[in-house]
Amino acid sequence: VLDNVMIGALSRTKAVEAARRDAEEIVEFLGMTGKKDALAGSLRVHELKRLEIAKALATKPKLLLLDEPMAGMNVVEQGRLISVLKRVHDAGTTLLVVEHVMHAVVNLCEHVTVMNSGQKIVEGGTREVLANEEVIRIYLGEEDKC
């Protein structure tokens, strides 16, 4: 795990010791210290996702793009990842998230854009957008069609 995160850090510095220190800080920040010597292939899905985020953070991005980060996770694992992503955001990284898991959207996002079939439907504050009648109709369906 640590070596994988170092690869991200080495993309911005050639100083191996500095990359190692940065990687260790990120591994600790993401709660993966107990796995730092583990092989990536031995990790579970939620741990692999955290590793991918750690590698990205090692590049010190201002903006982190995440495509379906909750995919393949159970509710408990999703909750842990939501907590991690909140900490990433609180540390100063802007998150752009494509996600269909609504409790993740509600807990992570301040601003939401809803799309359907490639078309923007509505954009605005999270609670306002999720209360939009068209959004509800598109994602939950109409009563008479159930």
Name the predicted role of every residue range.
Residues V1-C146:
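Glycine-rich phosphate-binding loops of nucleotide-dependent enzymes
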